[in-house]
């Protein structure tokens, strides 16, 4: 069964699907983000391969990560994207490989999601593959990656740097065409990443609130109450550290006055 599973991953049946086009222009229409920041972040991801988007709650880190990947791929191709969220109980078994119970409680060997996408990328070297890890700082990152942790480094990529995994005894390496983007809130100091080994393997890019973005100004200026609330939030942010600032994404969707009041009362006020 293990052999058949490997063969299916390395030699998948070709499926022809339509993927919606997505480029830089569309990104900048959908995301309140400056063009120079887009160019900088895109270049950082492609050059360094491992990037963590950090920032206060509500700045749109996950939203930005997903759409940045779309724009790099040139289309909304979910087949080349792994999205996962880390948490305290997330394990190496789920991420890399291990024995897990099936529907009737029998433990069977299963490949984890990261190992599967690495196998896909290895079999398709002309295309880029992306791993988006939401709340990356909420999991025990070194344990989740396990033996593969060192292999995500730029100079440790490729088949020449393979390791033998303890569980399956299979040879494993992280292909050159796999890119890892993590997101993390800087709001909770208890979850701050202080592990030097981790910081050495990732670049950290800070996402700031976009209240000064011209497109966002045009959006909120259409509603007098929203304009008043945004102005108040901007003033509050001046007295807050970068880690505690209130993000703009609370106000990005169309809202009537009642929605705005509820957002302020139940989402914004608890933060301050």
Predicted regions and their residues:
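Extended, charge-rich, solvent-exposed interface segments
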Residues: 4
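Aromatic- and Lys/Arg-enriched surface recognition patch
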Residues: 1
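AAA+ P-loop NTPase catalytic core and its hallmark functional loops
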Residues: 8-241, 258-266, 270
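Extended, composition-driven regions rather than compact fold-specific motifs
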Residues: 251-255
